[in-house]
Amino acid sequence: MKVGRTILLTILAVSLITCKNSKEEEFKPKLVYESAILQVTQITENCFIHTSFLQTNDFGNVPCNGLIVSDSKEVIIFDTPVNDKSADELIKWIKETLHYKIKGIIPTHFHDDCLGGLKSFHANKIPSYAYLKTIELAKENNFIAPQNSFNDSLLLKVGDKTILAKSFGEGHTKDNVVGYFPSEELLFGGCLIKELDATKGYLGDANVAVWSSTVENIKKRFPNLTLVVPGHGKYGNAELLDYTIDLFKTKHFGEDKFESK
């Protein structure tokens, strides 16, 4: 009887693991929209990465990621596309193809790959939210500033679910925040988080000395992340946090990979 019970428990355990793995693997990422200036890739049932391209003199079109979180025909967006033209295109696609309501836009820091298309969102009467320091820095640099500020963190409802935007400290900039979607254990790290094998990138507004500790704070707060989306490059899992922590703890020689402001 003991042997039979052990076999039964083993079968049940294997079945549970198999079901879990199947659930994790059942959604295959797919490109759902593409034009010359904008791409949208669905990565889960509720989340999409929007990628627009920042034209530079030396590096051509630099791809820049943002995140769309959806539930019950509502969306909240982290980071605008890089300019108003690509932002117009994204807003039109969400409204006319998804038929979803855009409840808000959250730029994760003050650079143009986060709020370069903010004018378009405001023209469409979409409210914008940002960390207080982001608004201050946007105004200092004569950029269009987000409308609504938060001191440390912000919780917003999207459909029946909740998203969090929060500052964990300085890194890529003084004002960088991350976005977290608890129901899918998904983190939008923006330019604070690097894709695997990336170099340090643009450091003109960075605090390199504390970058690693800031990401360590994120890792401690969200220990069960399944997906992590960086501001540039390929998304992955929590391994991107470890890579970023290591990158800014040690010296890495060689030419830095370009990352836009």
Language model segments and positions:
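Conserved beta-strand hairpin/beta-sheet module of binuclear metal-dependent hydrolase folds
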Residues: 43-89, 177-191
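Bacterial signal peptide processing site
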Residues: 20-22
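Active-site metal-binding motif and surrounding structural segment of the metallo-beta-lactamase
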Residues: 73-76, 85-128
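Metallo-beta-lactamase
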Residues: 26-27, 31, 35-37, 42, 74-75, 82-83, 168-171, 175-239, ...
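Bacterial N-terminal signal peptides that target proteins for export
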Residues: 1-8
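C-terminal motif of bacterial Sec signal peptides marking the signal peptidase cleavage site
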Residues: 15-18
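Divalent metal-coordination and catalytic microenvironments
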Residues: 46, 69, 79, 94, ...
